Amino acid sequence: MAQALSEEEFQRMQTQLLELRTNNYQLSDELRKNGVELSSLRQKVAYLDKEFSKAQKALSKSKKAQEVEVLLSENEMLQAKLHSQEEDFRLQNSTLMAEFSKLCSQLEQLELENRQLKEGVPGAAGAHVDGELLRLQAENTALQKNMAALQERYGKEAVRPSAVGEGQGDPPGDVLPTPLAPMPLAEVELKWEMEREEKKLLWEQLQGLESSKQAETSRLQEELAKLSEKLKKKQESFCRLQTEKETLFNDSRNKIEELQQRKEADLKAQLARTQKLQQELEAANQSLAELRDQRQGERLEHAAALRALQDQIQTAKTQELNMLREQTSELASELQHRQAEYEELMGQKDDLNSQLQESLRANSRLLEQLQEIGQEKEQLTQDLQEARKSAEKRKVMLDELAMETLQEKSQHKEELGAVRLRHEKELLGVRARYERELRELHEDKKRQEEELRGQIREEKARTRELENLQHTVEELQAQVHSMDGAKGWFERRLKEAEESLQQQQQEQEETLKLCREEHAAELKGKDEELQNVREQLQQAQEERDGHVKTISNLKQEVKDTVDGQRILEKKGSAVLKDLKRQLHLERKRADKLQERLQEILTNSKSRTGLEELVLSEMNSPSRTQTGDSSSVSSFSYREILKEKESSAIPARSLSSSPQAQPPRPAELSDEEVAELFQRLAETQQEKWMLEEKVKHLEVSSASMAEDLCRKSAIIETYVMDSRIDVSVAAGHTDRSGLGSVLRDLVKPGDENLREMNKKLQNMLEEQLTKNMHLHKDMEVLSQEIVRLSKECVGSPDPDLEPGEAN
């Protein structure tokens, strides 16, 4: 019994599972049909969108602003209805999925319990103990019954003592068979009692289990109701959270757009800054070139001035040497002449000759001193040249420093100018002092020369005057003494000049050391500043390179997006041409139907026209075909969607499969690849969200299409009922066909003809108003679906851009 019941429950569960699977398959089929209907509705929406644009133009030309406001309010109302329908569908879908998942889990649990009951693995010991307990209880009750029966039987046997007494003389072998004969029957009865009691106990346990199971099922149903209520509440909270999430998503998207705008502004500012830095660098290079030219010109001028000074010094030296040579030659010739005259003189003049020789020796010493002074002057000029060279070197160093430090402050330039002026003043002072000393030496030399000439003249006079020779000798001695004093004065003067020169050299060396130290410190500072400036320039160059790279990447992305947009425009233009062609055909068909309807309404006597109209209305594709094959345009648009899907599937496979991707170029770094993958994930997430929205819109459009079909069926039944009522009121019983009914309705001179026309006019007016409302609904849906289709079509393009760019 337990196994039979478990198998029945298992079969019932299997049937429930099969029903759920069939429902799932039906829902999937309905979803597929809804997708096909959505494709057809998209085509209709595109067509209605075109019609709406034309109608809007006509409205803008013909109608007033109030009617436009009414239409806009109705449009907003329909949008609100559409959103409410979407939310209802979401709630229903979520509840159905939750119930389905719960039922699946319950089915799995019940299958597991059934399997455990069949196998008996987990509770084998417990089941064995329960079976033994039942068997022992049944055996106990059976034994008790047997004991009672035996007691009754033995009581009856004790009442019959005579039978027992007669049997005492018999041998014991005859007494034993009487109790042994009923033993198998008692055992069978005992077993039968045991089995019966065991079955009773099992039946009681089974009833208890069924009652407990019913209580448990009722409890589970109550819990299911509570859970469904909780699920509804959670669904409502989920809808609220979904709306909040959408608002947050919109806010985040706006923030991202603001950040992108800020980034573009920062890029523009960086570009402007780099341009300014380039302009400043070019201006600095130009100023450096100008300063180099100026320093080169100054250097050339200094070199020319130095050469001119050297030429002047050389000419002065040569002139002085020539004059001294001439003077010495003249003096030597005169002395020789005088010596010849002195030799011709008497022996008295020997002393005078010796004195003259001494004077000549003194003159030679003076000449040697003059030569030494000239050598010292040359040394001084050489020192002056060395000082000038050092000054020029210093100027060159200062010029180089000035060229490297053009962008420094004006204070440092003024300090450098002050140092230069001080140095030039020192050089000018040293030069003036040297020139003054040279002039003094020249004056001393001239005075000495004049004195010597005067002495020579005096000697000539003394030679002429032989009489006053002694006086002249005395005068010469006095002159010799005076010359000795002049010699001492000259020696002292030379010592003072040497000491002053040594002091000046020491001072100049000290000043040169100080200047060198200052220049070394300044050079170190300038080198550090120059290194900092170079580092800044290098950083600016790196930033510029980075900006250039980002600009090139952005340009490439813009180019890729433009190419994708062109491709989409081409596809859209092809679809648009097809839709235009279909629109033209539909318009022609509508015009023909309108003409026929007008002919029927105007010509009330033409029966064939009305019959053809009704037959064409009954046999029209809009009556016979609904859903995915409502018109030719739906078929063409469905084919286009299939082509798009077939073209999108290899593109997705190319973008998703890592083996089919082309090798990554060497220019892309790991960070750029990570950014591309992140962008790909974001675009895929956006695409999935848009696909969900499109699915919801497809479901809502499918429901609207079903409403349209129902309304069209209601209109058909209304038309048919009205015609049947009219035919019954006229008393016609011939209902064999629609042609006979129409011929009865359109009899000439019939009174119901006007009522028929009025009903047809009312029906047409109602149909036109309904068509206008549906037009508006379809226009709203077309705008939404076109926007979503553009987003869905545009979202995979960024996924493929890196591959195309590679």
UniProtKB/Swiss-Prot annotation:
Gene: Gripap1
Name this protein carries in UniProt: GRIP1-associated protein 1
Native source species: Mus musculus
Positions where N-acetylalanine occurs in the chain: 2
Alphabetical list of PANTHER family matching this protein: GRIP-1 ASSOCIATED PROTEIN 1, GRIP1-ASSOCIATED PROTEIN 1
Region (Disordered): 616-635, 646-671
Keyword Protein transport assigned: yes
Compositional bias segments (type: Low complexity): 647-659
Membrane-topology descriptor: Peripheral membrane protein
Location of this chain's protein in the cell: Early endosome membrane; Recycling endosome membrane; Cell projection, Axon; Cell projection, Dendrite
Compositional bias segments (type: Polar residues): 617-635
